[in-house]
Amino acid sequence: MKKFFQETNIKEEKGDLFSIEDSSPIFAHCVSSDGKMDAGIAKQFVRRYGDGLQGSVDGFEVGDAVPYKNGDTKIYNLITKEKYWKKPTFKSIQSSLQSLKNRLVKNNEEKVYMPRIASGLDGKNWSKVKAKIKDVFDGSDIQITIRFL
């Protein structure tokens, strides 16, 4: 795998997100608080890990990082917008990343895998989103692997 972006704890590489070699992976991806996951990478998560993933965000708000467990796999739904058709803000992206970090630290979780969040269907500039990830996780011991095709 060719590495495109490497920080001390943040690695970006080309490859299928779902082909990682980890027996108990922890994923994170962006969703809306209305629970609609009918397109993009969210649809792939639902197809692989079940329809319960969509209902897991009920009652949560923008800025939350909502965990969902399926067997040995954990998925953090980063709620970055209210409705599936809206676009996230950089503030909501940063808030959900901070919530993710807080949950990972609290649960002694040291690794998370994610796609290039908010830059596909949500249309955010990847360089700016990547800077938010770096701002939130810089200096932490959490290893982040970002995969893209």
Q: Positions of the model-derived regions?
A:
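Macrodomain-like recognition of ADP-ribose-binding/processing modules
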Residues: M1-L149
